[in-house]
Amino acid sequence: MTDAIVKGLSTFQQVLVWIINLFWLYQFIISITSLIKFKEKPMLTDKKHRFIIALPANNEENVIGNLIKSLKMQDYDKSLFDIYVIADNCTDNTAEVARENGVIVYERFDETKKTKGYALNWFLDKMKDKKDDYDALLVFDADNVVDKNFLNVMNKKLCQGEVLVQGYRDIKNPTDTWVSGGYAIFYWTMNRLYHLARYNMGLSPLINGTAFMVKWDLLIDEGWNTKTLTEDIEFALINISKGVKLGWAKDAIVYDEQPLTFKESWKQRERWSVRTYSMC
């Protein structure tokens, strides 16, 4: 009996090792394609598209102004994009700061529905009368700073026929502490060896919470009907299941602020893990 148990455990261990090895072999093969420079997709049109930019914000009075200023400095025709701040359950001066920076503000108060997914769905419902006014939606987190060429790059992606595209999430504070430095290494690795690699292979990367574009007609009729707390991943998977191929824009750069202390990082990672588990 004991020999049978030992043999069973040994077999289980070997199977587990093979599964892990196959997983890492799969990751290695995909990551190799990140080193290959592929020919760009052909331009299907040379249109200058019109963008609606949504900035969901909950008590972000200290950072929202910097984001708006970076968007207003875009090297893109200013008449072709509108900036909306969704002040979501704010108890500070986020809405006032946004208005002072000259953008349109929508204030939302619903203590039972607090996530970004609910805020985006609520906002899109308000925008249904603007169905024909825009070509694509861009979404950013309130603590971001956006590279001046972001809209030009996303416009090019639309001209190439892309409909759902993730931008390059870089780090605003990589040298502040060892924690933020660790985040920087993580995102740099993911950007190169996951997002770019999968895109080069014709596979879909995932939406990463901020700095992404969705073609307007893909979104405006159905809204942002996600049910979980990881609304970005859920939205990506819903569209992948419908046959939508997600795109990757390595030159559409946004700078994102990361935690400085281990305690802040632990809380964030714990929150992300719980939210990801809720999708299972």
Specify the residue positions occupied by each region the protein language model found.
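Acidic helix N-cap motif at the loop->helix transition within catalytic regions
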Residues: 65, 92-99, 149
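Short, acidic, metal-binding catalytic loop of nucleotide-sugar glycosyltransferases
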Residues: 69-80
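The conserved acidic donor/metal-binding loop of glycosyltransferases
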Residues: 141-145, 225, 239
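Long helical/loop segments within the catalytic core of UDP-sugar-dependent glycosyltransferases
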Residues: 107-130, 148-228, 266, 270-280
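A conserved acidic beta->alpha catalytic loop
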Residues: 87-95, 110-112, 145
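Short beta-strand-to-loop acidic/aromatic patch adjacent to the donor-nucleotide binding site
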Residues: 131-145
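N-terminal membrane-anchoring/stem segments of glycan-assembly enzymes
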Residues: 1-47
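Cell-envelope/extracellular polymer assembly enzymes that use nucleotide-activated donors
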Residues: 49-52, 82, 234
